[in-house]
Structures are given as C-alpha cells and as structure tokens.
Amino acid sequence: FENPDQAVDTLQAAGISIPKVQISAGLRLPQVSKADIARIKLFDDEVYLHQVVAKTAYGMERYPDLGDAFASFKEAEKPEWRVHFHVPIFLAELDGFTTTRPAVEQFLARQAKNSVTDHLEVETYTWDVLPEEFRRDDVVTNIVKEMRWAQQQLGNGSTP
C-alpha cells in the first residue's frame, strides 16, 4: 500500500542512495468476497509463500501466506488485499483481479523523468506456478514482453 513517490522521497531525504529497484507487480483485490477467495485459490501454490496485506477499517493486517489470510477472512469487513504473487508487469488484470501495476507505472514515470537508480531489475519469478490459463506463451516470450513494456514506460530508450 506504499506510494512509490513517497518511499523514494523518504529515502532521498534521509540521504539513502537507491542502488537497485526491483520492478514487480502483485495481485490486488479491492473488496475481497467469498467468490474472490475461491478464484484466488488457483494462485495458492506449494512452492512460494504469498504474503498478504489486508487493509481493513481497523488498519493493516499481515499474513505470512494465502492460507493464513483465507483462515482469517471476514467478508463483512470488505478488506482490500495485496498479495505477494509476482504477476507479469504488462498485465493490468488477471482472472478479474487487478494488479499493482499502477504503482509500477508511477515509479517508472518518475524514473523516466528524474533517474532514481541506475539499476532496474524486472522480477517475475512465478512463471511456472501461474495458473495454467496464464501460461499460454513460453517464459522467454513473456520476459521479452515484460522488458518491452518496461522500456515503453520509460519512454527514453533506457533498458531495465
């Protein structure tokens, strides 16, 4: 739920350099419902932990993995979830879920205007555990799509 501009401003104001930024997007569920829970279970693999931050009327709640978030879910609270499941940055949505791509776009716009770092790394490592319907293209094709999308966002010929 952090704002990329505020995070960069805070680090720079403290005199902390930013040697590298990892560019990745996660899943965003604006108002989690029981139907969302059923659908997101497709993303609950046994390979990686997928931490969840839930924003409720009571504040932020953090869960070490999707299963923990499922167990604590209360539909009446209508929480917003951010799920640490790296999804392709070129996708604005997956299976009806939005992604945190707007934060990536915000950061890359800032990077294009006023360089924050010399080292950008596109970091999607979950290709093999994405639900089957999102694995139509091979990994190399998808990585190329991500790199091209990032370059377009930078708009100045920079390469991530």
Q: Predicted regions span which residues?
A:
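Acidic/histidine-rich catalytic cores of soluble enzymes
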Residues: F1-K78, R82, V87
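Flexible, acidic glycine-rich loops studded with aromatic residues
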Residues: E61-S158
